[in-house]
Amino acid sequence: QAIGQFCAEHDIQAVVVSGDLTQRARLREFYACKQFLDSLNLPYLVVPGNHDIPLYALWRRVFTPFYGYQLFFGSLERDLETEDFYILGVNSIRRRYHTKGHISLEQIERIDQKLQAAPSNKYKILLAHQPFYIPAHQYGQKDCPMLAKIALQRWSQNGLNAILHGHLHQSAVDDLNQVYDLKVKQPILAVQAGTAISHRLHAGRPNSFNTIHLDGQVKHYYFDTVLQCFR
């Protein structure tokens, strides 16, 4: 309800969810997520997270890992264009890895071509689950896709402005142009999402989400348990 209220009170162009739509990839969890997103009455884009494929049901993990996700959300990689934003979804989940992210050369090329064809006046965003950079002191550093820097070197040349990701369940922002010394004019923000609505919180952090504006400003919103709203 608090997120629905926030969306109703603000000028939101789209909602994006960077994976972990479910806890254990159960059909009822996917259904609940779809019902919630539809209730916002806004365009939305999602990508799968490592929690969105079966963990213990090995037969399903091997042969139909994305069945539940695709049943409710369709293609694993979709795009969304709004008045000011051009958002590309990329699937970084592989059945052979538990938490580690992966992107292929084919995915790098596809995103690169999409960026080249994107309207020059729109803010260009990539949506993935695993981060493309994790500071050395943070848990999960090994989960970055192996080809992350190679991908960024390509995409940065064609106007990428930001990567939105989840996985670490903690809000943060980094500039990948500085981190990887990409030598492009624009900042390339890595915007890390916290846990939006799950009751399973990490390290006592409150539920949270981010907003990103056309000028690149990122704001973090945290749930106030007293006022029962995000602020």
PLM ranges: what are they?
Residues 1-32, 38:
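N-terminal active-site segment of His-dependent metallophosphoesterases
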Residues 14-20, 44-50, 91, 125-128, ...:
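Active-site neighborhood of phospho(di)ester-bond hydrolases with catalytic His/Asp-centered motifs
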Residues 20-21, 93-105, 133-142:
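Surface-exposed cleft-lining segments at the edges of enzyme active sites
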Residues 23-28, 50-58, 95-98, 131-135, ...:
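Active-site environment of divalent metal-dependent phosphoester hydrolases
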Residues 31-110, 118, 154-156, 187, ...:
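Extended active-site neighborhood of metal-dependent phosphoesterases/phosphodiesterases
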Residues 120-137:
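Short acidic, glycine-rich surface-loop motifs adjacent to enzyme active sites
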Residues 140-215:
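Conserved beta-sheet core of the metallophosphoesterase superfamily
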Residues 213-231:
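A short C-terminal boundary segment appended to hydrolase-like catalytic domains
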